Amino acid sequence: MSTQVAKKSEVKKNWYIVDLDGKVLGRAATEIARVLRGKHKAIYSPSVDTGDFVVVVNAEKVKLTGNKMSAKMYYRHSGYPGGLRQANAAQMLEKKPEDLIKKAVKGMLPKNKLGRDMFRKLKVYTGSDHPHAAQQPLELNI
């Protein structure tokens, strides 16, 4: 008997909603990445996108443990000389809380074309409103 590999056409994509109100960033990001990859399903195959869509709400209410709010730094570079920009977690949470969640989850996904496809299924919003009510997302408890 040979091992069965999931086919992209056979995979049913579900929608999940995650409320990050009071949740720890890293613990929530690992669970979100697991669902995006499809590791929660019995038909998981590493070479096939078996993951589901994840809608994250209340991104601005996520917590970080210890003194990471002031000590954890995020860097980006514009490509121009002197173009290095840096911000700590508190500044990121104040200006772009969606990017803080996205960066944490993206680092936990594969660094290839399949990982980019998985990352596109992540939808992050500040506040509790989102435009995906028509998909009837299921509650994902973290």
Swiss-Prot record:
The keyword Nucleotide-binding does not apply. GO terms for biological process: negative regulation of translation; translation. GO terms for molecular function: mRNA binding; structural constituent of ribosome. Gene3D superfamilies: Ribosomal protein L13 (3.90.1180.10). Coiled coil: none annotated. GO terms for cellular component: cytosolic large ribosomal subunit. Keywords: Ribonucleoprotein, Ribosomal protein. InterPro entries: Ribosomal_uL13, Ribosomal_uL13_bac-type, Ribosomal_uL13_CS, Ribosomal_uL13_sf. PROSITE patterns: RIBOSOMAL_L13. This protein is one of the early assembly proteins of the 50S ribosomal subunit, although it is not seen to bind rRNA by itself. It is important during the early stages of 50S assembly. Belongs to the universal ribosomal protein uL13 family. Part of the 50S ribosomal subunit. This is Large ribosomal subunit protein uL13.
